[in-house]
Structure formats: C-alpha cells, structure tokens
Amino acid sequence: MGVAVVMGSKSDLELVRGALDTLESFGVEYTARVISAHRTPAEAAAFAKEVESGGKYQVVICAAGMAAHLGGVLASYTTKPIVAIPVPSQPFGAADSLLAIVQMPPGVPVAAVTAGKAGGKNAALYAISILALSDPALAEKLRDFRRRQREQIIAADAELQKELAK
C-alpha cells in the first residue's frame, strides 16, 4: 500500500516536502516523480495507467501551479483517488491553480487541499486517512497524531493564560 507523489516541476519539491515528510513519519511508502501534464503528457498518461493497473499505489498526490491540469490528466486515466495541491505562482498566487483543480468536469473527480506548504502536509494526511480505511494500525497512528495536535493546542492555551495572568 503506497502513495505516488507527482509534481509538475522539480521546483515544486520544497512545497511537496511536507507531504513526503508526513508520509515518512507515518511509515507510508511513497514514490516521488516529476511529470508535467503539458510538457510530458505521454509520460503522465503512462504513469497514471501504471497506477491504475498495479497494486503499488492506492492514492496519488500531485502538485502543480498555474494551469494545474496534472491532477485532472492523471484522474482521466485512473480510478484511484487524486489529491491535488495548488501551487502558488505569479501573478495570481494559487487562484489559477486552485480553479484548474476544482473545476473538473463531472465524472473525473480531483480532491483539492490547502494551497502552498500546508497543502503538502494536508495532502499526505488526506491520503493517509484513505489508506487507514483498510489499515487499522495506520488508523491508530492517525488518531494518535490528532490527539497530540489537540494536546499541543491545549498546552499552548494554558501557557498563554499563564502569561496573560501576570
């Protein structure tokens, strides 16, 4: 059970790093690739067909900016879940990539997460939640992660209250 992480350009690696680090921290196997929907469309189609026919990947995370068609192209060749990270670029920030991701025609869904670096982490957590549906140990790791997040916020609030009470 694994995740394919595909970026449209190697320059997206810094943003995708959050996804890779999160997958590693949960012990989820992944493969990372650079494949462009526009510059290497044949390779994009071939990779998506590999994802569809093989059992290696259950979820695909992709990151692309501008005319972010990578997720849609991959989704057109596989029924596996596609999670897309909108990559900010000039002059529109992440608005253009977000719209390209969410404006898919009926029948070819692509999920979108937060734009930018937070999107990398959220994409991985979303992929992990999908994998956890059939992996009880991974589901427990995800519950532990959420508990730790809650505890950190409660501790931060207690610290703030203590500081403000002075």
Task: Identify what each model region corresponds to.
Residues 19-25, 77-79, 128-129:
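Short, solvent-exposed amphipathic alpha-helical segments in soluble enzyme
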